[in-house]
Amino acid sequence: IEGKAATTDAVARIADGASGFRAFVEIPLADFAPLLDAVGERGLNAKVRTGGVTGEMFPEPEALLNFIEHACRANVPFKTTAGLHHLMRGDYRLTYDADSRKGTMFGFFNVFLTAAFVHAGMTDGAALALLLERDVKKFFVSSNAIRWGDRSVTTNDIRAARDCVAVSFGSCSFREPVDELHAAALIP
């Protein structure tokens, strides 16, 4: 079940109506903290938008990172949606129209790994650099860890982040994420 909430009262109404179901509450990134806290207190999951069909719909990286850090500290599960068609951050067409404008989009790999690293304890400015990383070749993936520069997260860290905080992401496309994972040799 999903719903949108711009107030803590709206979060409470969604919680009351979703009793017995796993519910995601879409909250705005602007002034998200009281809403995210209310979502967590009610045992719900958060949802935030990370893009759209215009450049203005993409949040500032610092705002998204602030949300991720807060969700990890509070152990509030969340999913991200919109604009996450691509593996890595980069400049891409905003729609599937041939003459579409381009904009800078987050990569689903960046967003998830940022959550995994933060959940595993990353507290310095490196998390923002990770969220902004554009080169998949800067990552080394093995059967027991993912390394980025001199930092790494184990598969147990990744599993914990996936189970506890960064539970899913939404993309308008199934093929693009899978194709880009194949192209980067991250999946067979």
Residue locations for each model-derived region?
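Expand to "…catalyze enediolate/carbanion chemistry for C-C bond making/breaking, isomerization
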Residues: 1-188
